[in-house]
A protein has these predicted regions:
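Phosphate-binding site of ATP-dependent enzymes
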Residues: 20, 159-257
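A short beta-strand-loop structural module common to alpha/beta enzyme folds
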Residues: 26-38, 167, 172
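Conserved N-proximal alpha/beta basic substrate-recognition cap immediately N-terminal to
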Residues: 7-19, 30-142
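Extreme N-terminal starter segment of soluble prokaryotic enzymes
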Residues: 1-3
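Loop-centered beta-sheet repeat module
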Residues: 130-182
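A long amphipathic alpha-helix within ATP-dependent nucleotide-binding catalytic cores
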Residues: 198-205, 209-210, 221, 238-291, ...
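Short acidic-glycine loop/turn motifs at beta-strand connectors
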Residues: 46-48, 57-58, 221-226, 287-290
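A short beta-strand motif that forms the metal-chelation/ATP-contact edge
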Residues: 162-165, 219-221, 290-305
Length: 331
């Protein structure tokens, strides 16, 4: 039985669940914001025992340590409520933190099972620095990359054009109606010099040599299967997807099914194998010489928009991946 760990608003599991039902693969969906209000949780550990059971409070669905065959972590979040109303807000928050702590430790305890969205290995794979190191080791071309809070280090770049990226912070809330999102931006050495040392030294800046693009590619790996889409981003203006294709969502950017070279697909598999992962969404720039340049891998990335645009059978491939592990446990 597959354990799906996510939240109620996450729609990505839905098409996969449709395939799981058709394939007769049992599953249990745990929406973590309702941990206390919708589920009964039991885990016993002793010298003789290591067993758990999670069941819905209506008793209609459950999963046990004997049944579980794989885990799919999508988008879990902290418990939003306790079962009973707690008037003391500090106490209520403490109890919800305890519930969230249990869920984190449960995912770590299940680390030896087959996973997509592996709770332990994904943390390591999320390092922007290690990703570049491993990408180079497996044979990818990577842009010259510098992390620095010293303005003089900009002179190390071999190219004049430089991409500025966020390391981990993706934005912040300006108001209840408005958020500021950090996208990749294009600059150059002269503009960075003009910032001055004071504006540079208060941040650990993530900088890459900017590569002029022919087009971009998004490749999704599930197990040994790969699905790629070409992104025609260069027809758009700089702030509408040309520099960071994510800005093109609202401006008519299109995605088409695409076959990447087998050598690139193999390097994707080698990259994930280093981290002992079975899933990853890779972003590439393809330059005007048809050379692929690795940008990053999101090891729990979104993919449903690609399936909707291209009809690539990604959700079916995820279901088949979990079916294989269900059958292996049953045999």
């Amino acid at each position: 039985m597959l354990l799906i760990i996510t939240n109620q608003e996450d729609i990505h599991p839905n098409p996969v669940i449709d395939h799981l039902i058709a394939l007769k693969v049992p599953f249990f969906r745990l929406n973590t914001e309702h941990l206390f209000s919708h589920y009964d949780v039991y885990y016993q550990i002793s010298n003789d025992t290591n067993e758990f059971c999670i069941r819905t409070k209506d008793g209609h669905h459950s999963i046990t340590s004997k049944q579980i065959s794989a885990v799919w972590e999508r988008r879990p979040c902290k418990p939003m409520t306790t079962f009973d109303p707690i008037e003391d807000e500090q106490l209520a928050n403490l109890l919800k933190e305890e519930g969230d702590g249990f869920m984190k430790y449960l995912r770590i305890a299940l680390h030896e099972l087959p996973w997509i969205g592996h709770a332990v290995n994904e943390y390591k794979a999320g390092s922007k620095l290690l990703q570049k190191i491993v990408a180079s080791k497996v044979g990818f071309n990577i842009p010259q990359t510098i992390f620095s809070n010293n303005l003089s280090d900009v002179e190390q770049f071999k190219t004049e054009k430089i991409a500025v990226k966020p390391i981990r912070a993706f934005g912040f809330e300006i108001s209840e109606q408005e958020n500021l999102i950090f996208y990749t931006s294009l600059t150059n050495k002269e503009k960075l010099r003009d910032l001055g040392e004071m504006n540079f030294r208060n941040n650990l800046n993530f900088l890459e040599s900017y590569i002029d693009k022919q087009y971009e590619v998004r490749t999704t790996i599930i197990g040994k299967a790969d699905f790629s889409a070409i992104i025609e981003s260069q027809q758009f203006e700089a702030d509408k997807g040309k520099i960071d294709w994510r800005q093109g969502y609202d401006h008519g950017m299109t995605f088409k099914a695409f076959e990447i070279p087998r050598s690139i697909a193999t390097q994707c598999l080698d990259f994930l194998a280093y981290f002992n992962l079975e899933f990853g969404c890779f972003d590439f720039i393809v330059d005007k010489n048809d050379t692929y340049h690795f940008l990053e891998c999101n090891t729990n990335g979104q993919w449903m928009w690609i399936e909707d645009e291209t009809q690539l059978p990604i959700s079916e491939a995820i279901a088949l991946f979990f079916m294989t592990h269900h059958e292996n446990k049953a045999s």
